[in-house]
């Protein structure tokens, strides 16, 4: 499976998360996943909620349109973005 998959109602992203980074950013390809650095620590779901908020801003969608499908408790996650309004250039470059 690719790091970014386009389907009828949006995008599915396979992510590798780096918590406690110095700033929030989409780093780029990391193996067969997209690496995303976030400032939140991996404690009590803070990293997940911060990731959802960050991706919501990047794709210009509501937080309810960012769904963690797999990997709630790990660094490797599968995220679905429903009907993105914009696609960040780092992600657009990975779409086949």
From Swiss-Prot:
SMART domains to which the protein is assigned, alphabetical: DUF167 (SM01152)
Listed InterPro entries: DUF167 (IPR003746), YggU-like_sf (IPR036591)
Name this polypeptide is given: UPF0235 protein YggU
Superkingdom field: Bacteria
Matching PANTHER family: UPF0235 PROTEIN C15ORF40
Organism: Escherichia coli (strain K12)
One GO CC term, this protein: cytoplasm
Membership in a protein family: Belongs to the UPF0235 family.
SUPFAM superfamilies in the record: YggU-like
Gene: yggU
Pfam families associated with the record: DUF167
